[in-house]
Amino acid sequence: MRTVPLFAACLLLTLMAQAEPLPRAADHSDTKMKGDREDHVAVISFWEEESTSLEDAGAGAGRRCICTTRTCRFPYRRLGTCIFQNRVYTFCC
């Protein structure tokens, strides 16, 4: 009988870990929301020997590419966009 509550607790923790945070209340000012917004960056590395569609687009093999909310910084240049969790990011290589 102790396994059922233990299983339920594990299931609840798993669901809570996968859940997305609730959106902020609409009464926050835009300036405060801009200050609290964090920059999301996803780092992607390509180490393939064969030609890929990304390589044809300019992302060569072994080149480090990132998806960021900001503009591309030197030495990166913009090659397109990334979509992750329904958000659009800048694809820089």
From Swiss-Prot:
Chain residues in the propeptide: 20-62
InterPro entries named among the record's database cross-references:
Alpha-defensin, Alpha-defensin_C, Alpha-defensin_N, Beta/alpha-defensin_C
PROSITE patterns, per this entry? DEFENSIN
Keyword line: Antibiotic, Antimicrobial, Antiviral defense, Defensin, Disulfide bond, Fungicide, Secreted, Signal
Q: Where is the signal peptide?
A: 1-19
* Example of a GO biological process term: antimicrobial humoral immune response mediated by antimicrobial peptide
Gene Ontology CC: one annotated term: extracellular space
Superkingdom is Eukaryota
Which residues form each disulfide bond in the chain? C65-C93, C67-C82, C72-C92
What's the chief localization of this chain? Answer: secreted
Is Signal among this UniProt entry's keywords? yes
Q: Where in the cell is it found?
A: Secreted
What PANTHER family does this protein map onto? Answer: ALPHA-DEFENSIN 1
Described purpose of this protein according to its UniProt entry? Has antibiotic, anti-fungi and antiviral activity.
Homology family: Belongs to the alpha-defensin family.
The name this protein goes by in its record: Neutrophil cationic peptide 1 type A
User: Source taxonomy lineage?
Assistant: Eukaryota, Metazoa, Chordata, Craniata, Vertebrata
